């Protein structure tokens, strides 16, 4: 009986499969990858390929001795916005704190004004260069949050822009509604009133339009309380939407544990997370998403509790947190380095945070690891060892990217 054909076969490379529990990086030397219908159908040693494998493939590709990793997954971005907050950067360098700037009307609210004034086309055009920078460093899936509109019309426009970016470029975009990002001017002094409006009108309408894949809340003393976050999570649960949270960045409030109680996909930032919060994440299977770009830009000193996260088996993801105020970063490779240097992750842990655990933070079980049956999303790297991705700064060693089995336009011919 004839075997089913393969669309492509990739030979002569080393594979960092990022499979858990085996060799470091899940490494396979002299590896081979076979693809059919956008899925991986063989991942292993070339010597273990079945007889006639090369004749079975419609196309053969020589990896040229390069390393191959899963496509990178940036699980936390605010990629769509208008305006700049470079002036706030200057103010922080002069001693102003993030909280002081926010309470004085800067921060998120200042971006809201510029974003509300931008058209859909303008939002897409401004985000495309940021997206292209991520793609150039091997990203095949990313999350994009709303949260810079804070009215139903402008939040809709942000989510529509995010969806459009996924059509304009060869990348999968997961959308997150972050209407509970800051208090809009129209509801000044009335946080509960805004949450009423968000839960009763904004979220149901946008979810009904198919624009929302998940729901997030900024749960901090300068943003929304535990009680307000609870109401948003309950509304999301009622609509069948998963939740996540910005929590424990500026102090210990309990937002991460609260979100874990709702089975949250992730709790993000978590610099001030305590052991009880870590235990809650572990019990719920909630991912801790570390954001070293914001930590660096805000010159924070309280590091996330990495040792406790390891001890209790909490999956650790990392992301760019690309946003105009606290992490204007479009380099996932830089985040690998920062996660190691600032948070003391190992290079392998950091890479797992941008692959396997990044996928988990988005609720995606079909990617993030090179394994048969999963999506054929992978990146080719001109490196001698996977640790070089976190080690070297400035050069981009990404040779090419394959998404759903289809090569994206490479920087160099195969």
Curated annotation (Swiss-Prot):
Textual note on the cofactor: Binds 1 zinc or iron ion per subunit.
GO biological process: L-histidine catabolic process to glutamate and formamide; L-histidine catabolic process to glutamate and formate
Subcellular localization(s) per the UniProt record: Cytoplasm
GO cellular component: cytoplasm
Enzyme class: hydrolase
Enzyme Commission designation: 3.5.2.7
Binding-site residues for 4-imidazolone-5-propanoate, renumbered to this chain: 85, 148, 181, 249, 326
Cofactor: Zn(2+); Fe(3+)
Pathway entry: Amino-acid degradation; L-histidine degradation into L-glutamate; N-formimidoyl-L-glutamate from L-histidine: step 3/3
Domain of life: Bacteria
Gene3D superfamilies: Metal-dependent hydrolases, Urease, subunit C, domain 1
Hydrolase among keywords: yes
Chain sites annotated for binding Fe(3+): 76, 78, 246, 321
Amino acids binding Zn(2+): 76, 78, 246, 321
PANTHER family: IMIDAZOLONEPROPIONASE (PTHR42752), IMIDAZOLONEPROPIONASE-RELATED (PTHR42752:SF1)
Family under the similarity heading: Belongs to the metallo-dependent hydrolases superfamily. HutI family.
Function: Catalyzes the hydrolytic cleavage of the carbon-nitrogen bond in imidazolone-5-propanoate to yield N-formimidoyl-L-glutamate. It is the third step in the universal histidine degradation pathway.
Protein name, entry field: Imidazolonepropionase
Species name: Rhodospirillum rubrum (strain ATCC 11170 / ATH 1.1.1 / DSM 467 / LMG 4362 / NCIMB 8255 / S1)
């Amino acid at each position: 009986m004839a075997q089913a054909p393969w669309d492509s076969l990739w030979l002569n490379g080393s594979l960092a499969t990022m499979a858990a529990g085996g060799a470091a990086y899940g490494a396979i030397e002299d590896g081979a990858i076979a693809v059919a219908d956008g899925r991986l159908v063989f991942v292993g040693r070339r010597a273990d390929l079945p007889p006639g494998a090369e004749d079975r493939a419609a196309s053969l590709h020589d990896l040229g001795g390069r390393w191959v990793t899963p496509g990178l997954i940036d699980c936390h971005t605010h990629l769509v916005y208008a305006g700049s907050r470079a002036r706030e950067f200057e103010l922080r360098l002069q001693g102003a704190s993030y909280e002081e700037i926010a309470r004085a009307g800067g921060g998120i609210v200042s971006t809201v004004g510029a974003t509300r004034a931008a058209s859909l086309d303008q939002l897409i055009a401004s985000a495309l260069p940021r997206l292209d920078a991520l793609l150039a460093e091997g990203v095949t899936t990313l999350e994009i949050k709303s949260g810079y509109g804070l009215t139903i019309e402008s939040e809709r426009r942000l989510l529509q822009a995010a969806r459009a970016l996924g059509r304009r470029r060869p990348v999968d975009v997961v959308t997150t509604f972050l209407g509970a990002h800051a208090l809009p001017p129209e509801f000044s002094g009335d946080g509960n009133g805004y949450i009423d409006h968000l839960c009763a009108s904004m979220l149901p309408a946008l979810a009904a339009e198919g624009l929302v894949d998940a729901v997030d809340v900024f749960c901090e003393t300068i943003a929304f309380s535990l009680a307000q976050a609870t109401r948003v999570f309950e509304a999301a649960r009622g609509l069948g939407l998963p939740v996540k949270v910005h929590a424990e960045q500026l102090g210990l409030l309990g937002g991460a544990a609260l979100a874990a109680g709702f089975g949250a996909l992730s709790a993000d930032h978590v610099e001030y997370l305590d052991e009880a919060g870590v235990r809650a994440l572990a019990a719920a299977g909630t991912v801790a998403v570390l954001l070293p770009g914001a930590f660096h830009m805000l010159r924070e000193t309280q590091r996330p509790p990495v040792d406790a996260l390891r001890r209790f088996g909490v999956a650790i993801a990392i992301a760019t947190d690309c946003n105009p105020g606290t992490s204007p970063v479009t380099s996932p490779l830089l985040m690998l380095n920062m996660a190691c240097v600032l948070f003391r992750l190992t290079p392998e842990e950091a890479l797992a945070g941008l692959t396997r655990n990044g996928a988990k933070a988005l609720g995606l079980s079909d990617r993030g690891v090179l394994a048969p049956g999963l999506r054929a999303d992978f990146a080719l790297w001109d490196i001698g060892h996977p640790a070089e991705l976190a080690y070297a700064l400035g050069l981009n060693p990404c040779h090419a990217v394959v998404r759903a089995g289809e090569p994206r336009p490479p920087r160099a011919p195969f």
